[in-house]
């Protein structure tokens, strides 16, 4: 197994205090934030559930600022998300805007830096970490808060550069330490989770094929 299961992510998110706001894990058909007056968040896969999943993203809705946050651990642009994963979220944003604001307008803020290594399978866990930041600091979840300050972002264009690998490896180590402090579920299943989400997991899978 590689990556994180929906059950694991839901358990960790609950441990991190996101339960009252968490709409669950979804595939690419996530309908959006339809109760527009409530703080809400979700973890969304870029693929259909029938495929087994490809890559996890996190979304948060702050009704006070009418802002939708999209966190991608790789920090890909809209164009690259569509190119690599065939993932489009415009329809979700339109549904959210219709439901959430009188003037049908909202702001989108998305991550632009890479915090995850190119062969890491920890995207779901990074999404859990972001949602902890979102529910505790909903006006500044991307950075400038104690949770996300544990990670160091690098420009997305350097994702495949050997010179940033030590930084991205440290990020994954910080991620595991953070979850070990805050999630009893992670502590109970740490060895299995770290094996399935290892920093070089995708490389391991390529070699074994």
UniProtKB/Swiss-Prot annotation:
Note: All late proteins expressed from the major late promoter are produced by alternative splicing and alternative polyadenylation of the same gene giving rise to non-overlapping ORFs. A leader sequence is present in the N-terminus of all these mRNAs and is recognized by the viral shutoff protein to provide expression although conventional translation via ribosome scanning from the cap has been shut off in the host cell.
Induction section of the entry: Expressed in the late phase of the viral replicative cycle.
Pfam entry (one): Peptidase_C5
One of the protein's GO biological processes: proteolysis
Self-association state and partner proteins as the record states: Interacts with protease cofactor pVI-C; this interaction is necessary for protease activation.
UniProt main location, coarse: virion
Domain of life according to the entry: Viruses
Active-site residues from the entry: 55, 72, 123
Family annotation (InterPro entries): Papain-like_cys_pep_sf (IPR038765), Peptidase_C5 (IPR000855)
EC primary class: hydrolase
E.C. designation(s): 3.4.22.39
Family listed: Belongs to the peptidase C5 family.
Name by which UniProt lists this protein: Protease
Catalytic activity: Cleaves proteins of the adenovirus and its host cell at two consensus sites: -Yaa-Xaa-Gly-Gly-|-Xaa- and -Yaa-Xaa-Gly-Xaa-|-Gly- (in which Yaa is Met, Ile or Leu, and Xaa is any amino acid)
Role description: Cleaves viral precursor proteins (pTP, pIIIa, pVI, pVII, pVIII, and pX) inside newly assembled particles giving rise to mature virions. Protease complexed to its cofactor slides along the viral DNA to specifically locate and cleave the viral precursors. Mature virions have a weakened organization compared to the unmature virions, thereby facilitating subsequent uncoating. Without maturation, the particle lacks infectivity and is unable to uncoat. Late in adenovirus infection, in the cytoplasm, may participate in the cytoskeleton destruction. Cleaves host cell cytoskeletal keratins K7 and K18.
Regulation: Requires DNA and protease cofactor for maximal activation. Inside nascent virions, becomes partially activated by binding to the viral DNA, allowing it to cleave the cofactor that binds to the protease and fully activates it. Actin, like the viral protease cofactor, seems to act as a cofactor in the cleavage of cytokeratin 18 and of actin itself.
Site (Cleavage): 52-53
Keywords for this protein: Autocatalytic cleavage, Disulfide bond, DNA-binding, Host nucleus, Hydrolase, Late protein, Protease, Thiol protease, Virion
């Amino acid at each position: 197994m590689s990556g994180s299961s929906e059950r694991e992510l839901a358990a960790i998110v609950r441990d991190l205090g996101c339960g009252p706001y968490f709409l669950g894990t979804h595939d690419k058909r996530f309908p959006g934030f339809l109760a527009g007056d409530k703080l809400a968040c979700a973890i969304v896969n870029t693929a259909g559930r029938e495929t087994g999943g490809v890559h996890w993203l996190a979304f948060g809705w702050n009704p006070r600022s009418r802002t939708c946050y999209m966190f991608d651990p790789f920090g890909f642009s809209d164009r690259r998300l569509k190119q690599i994963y065939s993932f489009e979220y415009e329809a979700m944003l339109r549904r959210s805007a219709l439901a959430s604001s009188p003037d049908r307008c909202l702001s989108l803020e998305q991550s632009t830096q890479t915090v995850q290594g190119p062969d890491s399978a920890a995207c779901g866990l990074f999404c859990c970490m972001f949602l902890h930041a979102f529910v505790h600091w909903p006006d500044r979840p991307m950075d400038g808060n104690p949770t996300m300050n544990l990670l160091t972002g690098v420009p997305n264009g350097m994702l495949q550069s050997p010179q940033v690998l030590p930084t991205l490896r440290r990020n994954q180590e910080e991620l595991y330490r953070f979850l070990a402090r805050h999630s009893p579920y992670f502590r109970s299943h740490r060895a299995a989770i770290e094996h399935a989400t290892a920093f070089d997991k995708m490389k391991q899978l390529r070699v074994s094929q």
